[in-house]
Curated annotation (Swiss-Prot):
Keywords: Amino-acid biosynthesis, Histidine biosynthesis, Hydrolase, Methionine biosynthesis, Multifunctional enzyme, NADP, One-carbon metabolism, Oxidoreductase, Purine biosynthesis. This is Bifunctional protein FolD. The gene is folD. PROSITE patterns: THF_DHG_CYH_1, THF_DHG_CYH_2. NCBIfam families: PRK10792.1 (NF008058), PRK14186.1 (NF010783), PRK14188.1 (NF010785). Catalyzes the oxidation of 5,10-methylenetetrahydrofolate to 5,10-methenyltetrahydrofolate and then the hydrolysis of 5,10-methenyltetrahydrofolate to 10-formyltetrahydrofolate. Homodimer.
Length: 296
């Protein structure tokens, strides 16, 4: 019997429906409309697609959506001024600066300029600190969207995570480190590994939960896994195109075929973690709006 398929697309849809209902209630009973602003600098094709998707989904759940499109030649000072204007705008609850930025703009400086209470990506050092000391836990606070979505998927399969052993493969500030912090807050016993960790297969075999976010195509094999483990594959890698094909196959960091034969539950790529990321961006924006209303 194969692993249970964790359908991130369907779960994200359910989350968006709950968000839409809460947005409607906020409008009806408190006169609040969550506002999400995305700052896009330049003409990067992938960024244009991502921003378009975020805008479409924000509008679909009833949010106020603003996309600030700036030319690639926009100066760092002008981008900072735009961020400061959005910080001061009472109709905007969430601010997201789409990365990457043009080479002449310091990404860290721009991200630091965002009001931490409007930092729906959860990348500001204040929010990183809140997560590390347990003030944020995936249900409260501005937590990076991909780890937040992964935690929701895990809880959907396992319920209470207390006492589970968990391995996070990957140490990025965007996924790996915050994922480990969230699992700690959920009372897991957590190991954080990376591509240079020794005896990685042996580590994996001892774990109830494996989160792969290392950026290496199909690195985690089925024989690395403990039977019945829950596997969350954050990877998104495009293999070289086969002769005559326009595009290569999209795969994760886990060898899906072999892993699905051993795991108890697993996310596919695509259709697993990816859809949860934008849904959690909307969830963070909603939470920021509710915090604004509470402080009014």
């Amino acid at each position: 019997m194969g692993a249970h398929l964790i359908d991130g697309k369907a779960i994200a849809q359910q989350l968006r429906e709950r968000i839409a209902q809460e947005v409607a209630d906020l409008k009806a009973h408190r006169g609040l409309v969550p506002g999400l602003a995305v700052v896009l600098v330049g003409e990067d094709a992938a960024s244009q697609v991502y921003v378009g998707s975020k805008e479409k989904m924000a509008v679909a759940v009833g949010m106020h959506s603003v996309v600030c499109r700036l030319a690639a030649t926009t100066s760092e000072a002008e981008v900072l001024a735009k961020v400061e204007a959005l910080n001061a705008d009472p109709t905007i609850d969430g601010i997201l600066v789409q990365l990457p930025l043009p080479a002449h703009i310091d990404e860290d400086k721009i991200l630091l300029a965002i009001d931490p209470d409007k930092d729906v990506d959860g990348f500001h050092p204040v929010n990183v600190g809140r997560l590390s000391i347990g003030q944020s836990n995936g249900e409260h606070g501005m937590v990076p969207c991909t780890p937040k979505g992964c935690l929701m998927l895990l809880k959907g399969v396992l319920g209470d995570l207390t006492g589970k052993t968990a391995l996070v493969i990957g140490r990025s500030n965007i996924v790996g480190k915050p994922m480990a912090q969230l699992l700690l807050s959920a009372n897991c016993t957590v190991t954080l590994a990376h591509s240079r960790s020794r005896d990685l297969p042996d580590l994996c075999r001892r774990m109830d939960i494996v989160v792969a976010a290392v950026g290496r195509p199909e690195m985690v094999k089925g024989d690395w896994l403990k039977p019945g483990a829950v596997v969350i594959d954050v990877g998104m890698n495009r293999l070289p195109a086969a002769p005559g094909a326009e595009k290569g196959k999209l795969v994760g960091d886990v060898d899906y075929a072999s892993a699905a034969a051993v795991a108890g539950a697993i996310t596919p790529v695509p259709g697993g973690v990816g859809p949860m990321t934008i849904a959690c961006l909307l969830a963070n924006t909603l939470e920021a709006c509710k915090a604004r209303g509470a402080g009014a």
